[in-house]
């Protein structure tokens, strides 16, 4: 399929122009079916060598939120505990083990063999890409998102990923946003401030 057709203005608004970072959510649950549908969109986003290093934990239960709570900064705790879903966006630093399946037309695994430190940058970069896809896919499905980094990564890793090569990156609260929790819309940089032609 060639990407030849632009999305209409309403779709672009939903994804970008009128979408907001949410700080409060309606008391409406998000089903596991919707979260699975969300991942089924996210997985198609491009990553280097189709490495797909992101790993997602959808924290929806009271037990899961209790496990997450000690890692949250004071300013993020209340809204995170109240959100229907908090996604831990993480990455697997041993992602290369799956490359024979994910990238079969080249020996991509050999590119990343060796000390784990040599894979950290790629895992972080491509996992971050997948986290961004998650936010846009959520918006496309009618969900609202509140991404944040105000938490203790080491505590999250100990609570959710102990004994594994998986490292947390950032959190995303998901649900159906409550406009009462929005801050006034902040400005963005103009093209000339952020970009140039060469």
Swiss-Prot record:
EC code(s) of this entry: 1.-.-.-
InterPro entries for this protein: Nitroreductase, Nitroreductase-like, Nitroreductase_HadB/RutE, RutE-like
Cofactor: FMN
Domain of life: Bacteria
Key words, A-Z: Flavoprotein, FMN, NAD, NADP, Oxidoreductase
GO MF, one annotated term: oxidoreductase activity
Family: Belongs to the nitroreductase family. HadB/RutE subfamily.
Stated name of the protein: Putative NADH dehydrogenase/NAD(P)H nitroreductase XAC0554
Lineage: Bacteria, Pseudomonadati, Pseudomonadota, Gammaproteobacteria, Lysobacterales
